[in-house]
């Protein structure tokens, strides 16, 4: 399992944002799923992502990720407007598994409200990650 970036924040639903919780509101953040999620899902074969301009709400479903094992809802860890979608994942879904905290990012949001976010240590502890 990949190391959790310490400068990211995490949701209980296994999404990450590339910012700390205290610096989120008013900024644009990238969002993806964690290595814990990709390990549990297995090989990702499809992702339905929100569209640019969509409003997402923290804790609400905004897409889904399909793997060889199951289909899982994608939840937004923040509230705001989608400003970009990583079209590259549609060309190669394996990047979500291979680089979940880098090239496997899913979408970007201009944040108006943060949800309940955890530090890397809190997320690791809650999910039994060393």
UniProtKB/Swiss-Prot annotation:
Cofactor, how bound (note): Binds 1 lipoyl cofactor covalently.
Pfam families linked: GCV_H (PF01597)
SUPFAM superfamilies, per the entry: Single hybrid motif
Gene Ontology CC annotations of this record: cytosol; glycine cleavage complex
Domain of life: Bacteria
Cofactor section: (R)-lipoate
Alphabetized Gene3D superfamilies for the sequence: 2.40.50.100
N6-lipoyllysine, modified sites: 69
HAMAP family, per the entry: GcvH
Function of the protein: The glycine cleavage system catalyzes the degradation of glycine. The H protein shuttles the methylamine group of glycine from the P protein to the T protein.
NCBIfam families for the chain: gcvH, PRK01202.1
Protein name (Swiss-Prot/TrEMBL): Glycine cleavage system H protein
